Amino acid sequence: MIEFVKQTAIRAGLFALSEQRRLDTSAIYSKQTAKDLVTDTDRAVEQLIVSELEKRFPGYGIYGEEFGHSNTNSEYCWLIDPIDGTASFIHGLPNWAISIGLHKNGVPVLGVVYSPVMNKLYYAETGKGSWCNGEKLSVSPYQKLSDVIVSTGIACIRSEWTEENNLKFLSRIAPKVVDFRKYGSAALDCCSVASGQLGAYWELKLEPYDYGAGELIVTEAGGRVSDLYGKNNYPEHGIIFTNSSIHNEILQEFYDYKALHR
């Protein structure tokens, strides 16, 4: 199964890459807000992926970013983000990827993330580890928050909702780490945690298709995933991916901030 999904992701990614090189601004649209963007390519890529998966695995549910839900109560459900990092895609940046995850009864069992610009194919299956271009992945060995680079998103400051502005958490964490990065693709951020490049990545607002593949890639590489309270109520209560070793330390920082600002 995973070989088919990998080839589907590669095919979709190469198609998207060819479209990026000739992207017409008239093919860019807004979704819920003026800065929540989608392109004709996002939609075409999702249709390509769904078509391939439905032919090979009929009856499986589909949860895609662009065309919504289909048969999601089935035992197996695909979670698809056709271009994770659309803003980067539009502006010619490399930080975007194809993300395809498979859940069985709500539990991730397979994940594939393909970055066509960087030519990196990340993948994982339950119990088989995480891999990139044939090399086994492992999270970073660092034991302290002060030794790692972290990533997050601050898209909240571009939208209408401001109740839970991630900048306040970033300002709490940033002085305590080596450095901060913002890549703009949840799938690639997860893969960076799995690869040992990042010690942690968190978000306040994600959809299941954003991390549908990345969650398993992180955990199979030895990482840990939880909400911002250390429980499994994600993404409703935020979501964080770490190398496991620093998980409790960074959660304590979130807790301390909330305790100070009640």
What is each model feature region?
Residues 43, 47, 66, 82-85, ...:
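Generic detector of well-ordered alpha-helical packing
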Residues 16, 42, 53, 86, ...:
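Residue-level signal for inorganic ion chemistry
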Residues 72-131:
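DPxDG-like acidic metal-binding loop motif
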Residues 103-107, 117, 126-129, 135, ...:
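Short loop segments at secondary-structure junctions
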Residues 70-72, 105, 123, 141-144, ...:
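Solvent-exposed alpha-helices and their adjacent loops that cap or buttress functional pockets
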Residues 34, 118, 233-236:
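Short acidic/glycine-enriched loop/turn segments that link adjacent beta-strands
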Residues 138-262:
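An extended, acidic
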Residues 1-83, 249, 255, 262:
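N-terminal subdomain of lithium-sensitive/metallo-dependent phosphomonoesterases centered on the IMPase/IPPase/PAP
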